[in-house]
UniProtKB/Swiss-Prot annotation:
<dbReference type="InterPro" id="IPR050068">
    <property type="entry name" value="MurA_subfamily"/>
</dbReference>
<dbReference type="InterPro" id="IPR013792">
    <property type="entry name" value="RNA3'P_cycl/enolpyr_Trfase_a/b"/>
</dbReference>
<dbReference type="InterPro" id="IPR005750">
    <property type="entry name" value="UDP_GlcNAc_COvinyl_MurA"/>
</dbReference>
<dbReference type="GO" id="GO:0051301">
    <property type="term" value="P:cell division"/>
</dbReference>
<dbReference type="GO" id="GO:0071555">
    <property type="term" value="P:cell wall organization"/>
</dbReference>
<dbReference type="GO" id="GO:0008360">
    <property type="term" value="P:regulation of cell shape"/>
</dbReference>
<feature type="binding site">
    <location>
        <position position="328"/>
    </location>
    <ligand>
        <name>UDP-N-acetyl-alpha-D-glucosamine</name>
    </ligand>
</feature>
<keyword id="KW-0131">Cell cycle</keyword>
<dbReference type="GO" id="GO:0019277">
    <property type="term" value="P:UDP-N-acetylgalactosamine biosynthetic process"/>
</dbReference>
<keyword id="KW-0808">Transferase</keyword>
<feature type="modified residue" description="2-(S-cysteinyl)pyruvic acid O-phosphothioketal">
    <location>
        <position position="117"/>
    </location>
</feature>
<comment type="pathway">
    <text>Cell wall biogenesis; peptidoglycan biosynthesis.</text>
</comment>
<dbReference type="InterPro" id="IPR001986">
    <property type="entry name" value="Enolpyruvate_Tfrase_dom"/>
</dbReference>
<feature type="binding site">
    <location>
        <position position="306"/>
    </location>
    <ligand>
        <name>UDP-N-acetyl-alpha-D-glucosamine</name>
    </ligand>
</feature>
<feature type="binding site">
    <location>
        <position position="93"/>
    </location>
    <ligand>
        <name>UDP-N-acetyl-alpha-D-glucosamine</name>
    </ligand>
</feature>
<feature type="binding site">
    <location>
        <begin position="122"/>
        <end position="126"/>
    </location>
    <ligand>
        <name>UDP-N-acetyl-alpha-D-glucosamine</name>
    </ligand>
</feature>
<keyword id="KW-0963">Cytoplasm</keyword>
Length: 440
């Protein structure tokens, strides 16, 4: 079984470079379907399992795709197929983002019901509501969603019941080639939405207001291939910020954009963590003692749900009681049981987790229940006594490029291995945690 093994007790230091954003690159790749002429080149594409899945989805649609050295090249000028099969879509929820572009381009899409991390129902009704408002007919059956439109989609006004990132992206892409103007209200405001809008506009679309609650999309007749550089991954950056803070370390996160991380930075300051914003990244210096804080996840610009589990790991080390309230997903506390296996003192009350710290974490074998939970368990292992062994790395690989290797280069005692039962019997005793005494 492949595992990440962490032996706690080392203070992190040095520099780490953030990859292109997973949550930005997947919709950008989907949007490349809209280009009926020319070739699209997408830069800073991270080497992630989800990227390879999206590559196979596009190839299945008869699209030419090349991916090498962080550059994703797409030529979608061939006659398109319109079905994304379960084989690929089951692996990754973002595969559903091809529906909007296919509807806009050829008027038909048949997509298997999506998969991905099991962190809540995450319904796709808001996507379908938007397509139907633009004139599509939608049918669901036999594990597939099929949408059709006669002629072109029609621009209209759409109000989202919740500022869903995926629905905002799918509707934006569909509306880019609709007849007339679409006004999308209560839209998601994440930086990844702005990244997608910039790419669509480079292709010839007319998208205004991305990054605000109201987006206006004036439909055009044709989109062409374009070049685009993906924004840096704010969640990966945040994960390494927590790694520095939890170990009392001093780490520079190259490529981190402070404007994308304001809620996290604010909470870290409350906890006593020092951050220094520089032109090309953020330096994070962990304190000798962490203070407790309360956190409530919210759609952007609120605290990101994708940083909830990592912050829970950090709060386990804080001196006092903290409360995390999860408002975005109803089932995103599955990692709590894994933290408890490591001696984490956490109580669940409805949508809130009450963390009583500081906890002297103990190494254990734990399971990555989803993508971000896997990273959080690795973070906890950095300060746990003994060895922490994290399994189900398929989840971690969906969102992190060489997480263990990057942490090792910062000084962590960590490795990724195929472990046998015999090796489990020969693990050494833990090293003591060294505290940072050189704060600036």
């Amino acid at each position: 079984m492949e595992k990440i093994i962490v032996r706690g007790g080392r203070q992190l230091s040095g520099s780490v470079k953030v990859e292109g954003a997973k949550n930005a690159v997947l919709p950008v790749i989907a949007a490349s379907i809209l280009a009926s002429r020319g070739t699209s080149k997408i830069y800073d594409v991270p080497k992630l399992a989800d990227v390879y899945t999206m590559k196979e989805v596009l190839r299945n649609l008869n699209i030419n795709v090349e991916y090498e050295n962080g550059e994703f090249v797409v030529n979608a000028t061939n006659p398109l197929k319109t079905e994304a099969p379960f084989e690929y879509v089951r692996k990754m929820r973002a595969s559903f983002l091809v529906m909007g572009p296919l509807l806009a381009r050829v008027g038909h899409a048949r997509i298997a019901l999506p998969g991905g991390c099991a962190i809540g129902s995450r319904p796709i009704d808001q996507h379908l509501k938007g397509f139907e408002a633009m004139g599509a007919t939608v049918e669901i059956g036999n594990g597939f969603i099929e949408a059709k439109v006669e002629g072109r989609l029609q621009g209209t006004k759409i109000y989202l019941d919740f500022p869903s990132v995926g629905a905002t992206e799918n509707i934006m892409m569909a509306a880019a080639m609709a007849e007339g103007t679409t006004i999308l209200e209560n839209a998601a405001e994440e930086p990844e939405i702005v990244c997608l809008a910039n790419y669509l506009n480079a292709m010839g679309a007319k998208v205004r207001g991305a990054g605000t609650g109201v987006i206006r999309i004036e439909g055009v007749d044709e989109l062409v291939g374009a070049e685009h550089t993906v924004i840096s991954d704010r969640i990966e950056a945040g994960t390494f910020m927590v790694a520095a803070a939890i170990t009392g370390g001093d780490v520079f996160i190259e490529g981190a954009v402070a404007e994308h991380l304001r809620p996290l930075i604010a909470k870290m300051h409350e906890m006593g963590v020092k951050t220094i914003e520089e032109d090309n990244g953020i330096r994070v210096i962990g304190p000798d003692e962490l203070k407790p804080v309360d956190i409530k996840t919210m759609p952007h610009p609120g605290f990101p749900t994708d940083m909830q589990s990592q912050m829970m790991a950090l709060l386990l080390r804080a001196n006092g009681t903290s409360v995390i309230t999860e408002t975005v997903f109803e089932n995103r506390f599955m990692h709590v049981e894994e933290f408890r296996r490591m001696n984490g003192n956490i109580k669940i009350e409805g949508r809130s987790a009450i963390i009583s710290g500081p906890c002297q974490l103990q190494g254990a074998e734990v399971t990555a229940t989803d993508l971000r939970a896997g990273a959080a368990l690795v973070l906890a292992g950095l300060v746990a006594d003994g060895h922490t062994r994290v399994v189900e790395l398929k989840h971690v690989d969906r969102g992190y490029v060489d997480l263990a290797g990057k942490l090792a280069r910062l000084g962590a005692d960590i490795e990724r291995v195929v472990e046998t039962e015999h090796e489990l019997e020969n693990l050494d005793a833990p090293a003591p945690l060294k505290l940072n005494t050189n704060l600036v």
